[in-house]
A protein has these predicted regions:
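Catalytic center-proximal scaffold of phosphoryl-transfer enzymes
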Residues: 1-271
């Protein structure tokens, strides 16, 4: 929420009357005290074997920036950059990317990087297939691929620790991708080409139980930023943007360790 609305909320609900300047000073103190923890979170992510990535546009000082998230089962790091190309991650994480399995959407920047392994988000693909099924309901090509993906996800969920060979699943997918769907329209052809391009990264979650089939963790982690931008549309300062992303990193990481957001923020004022 903007500082003015926070001050209004504290006044109306709790009878407190901090000035907006006090709120800024508290945010500045929390951000400063959070730096050692932010660096430690980054180190843990760089040493992690499976990392989910996502990015979202955010306006700051009337300028389009990009908020990025890198997250694992135990850690979340959000940060701001002026672009959404692969160089952002290279500059941030260096050669540690080569030791990671990345879980991402199909944004081209992720495929320009040399990850150890890669998994595309099945939830994204299923949404795109559902859209095509609704767009043209007199065909079953998109439904067949969606059912194949759901079957693979069910197989993993039913056998959470098993190493499941992906060869037979790829063969079934290839048979569907060989079908002529020119008559279905451009959007079908576009998705078909996209699936062919990322074919090798669709079923990797079957062969490694540590790899999730979706990137929902990254989407959840960046969702509060989108809510903030719906409320106030933009960040008025670089400090405000960075403070929100860094404090959100602290809170999300704390929650993954069964700590409350209140305790996480409170700890920043006890340093």
């Amino acid at each position: 929420l903007p500082y003015g609305r926070i001050a209004s909320f504290l006044r109306e609900v709790f009878g407190l009357a901090p000035s907006e300047g006090s709120l800024v000073n508290w945010a500045r103190e929390a951000k400063r005290n959070a730096q050692p923890a932010i660096e430690k979170i980054k180190e843990y992510i760089m040493s992690s074997s499976v990392v989910g990535f996502d990015e979202s546009g955010c306006y700051c000082n009337k300028r389009l920036d990009w908020a990025w998230i890198a997250q694992t089962v135990y850690y979340t790091l959000l940060f701001r950059a002026n672009g959404r190309n692969s160089k952002v991650l290279t500059d941030k994480f260096g050669d540690s990317l080569e030791r990671m399995t990345a879980v991402t959407d199909r944004h081209s920047a992720y495929f320009a990087l040399q990850f150890l392994n890669h998994q595309v988000c099945m939830a994204h693909l299923l949404r795109e297939l559902q859209y095509l099924s609704e767009l043209k309901d007199k065909q079953d090509w998109s439904d067949k691929i969606a059912n194949l993906f759901r079957e693979a996800i069910h197989e993993r969920n039913s056998n959470p620790s098993a190493i499941i060979p992906k060869a037979s699943w790829l063969e079934r997918l290839d048979n569907l991708l060989k079908l002529n769907i020119c008559n279905f329209g451009k959007k079908f052809e576009t998705l078909k080409k996209g699936l062919i391009k990322c074919r090798d990264y669709i079923f990797n979650f079957l062969e490694d139980p540590m790899i999730p089939s979706d990137n929902n963790g990254s989407e959840r982690g960046i969702r509060k930023l989108k809510i903030k931008l719906k409320n106030s549309c933009t960040f008025r300062s670089d400090f405000g943007a960075d403070a929100l992303l860094e404090l959100h990193s602290i809170v999300e990481t704390a929650k993954k360790h069964n700590k409350t957001p209140f305790n996480a923020i409170q700890a920043l004022f006890e340093v």
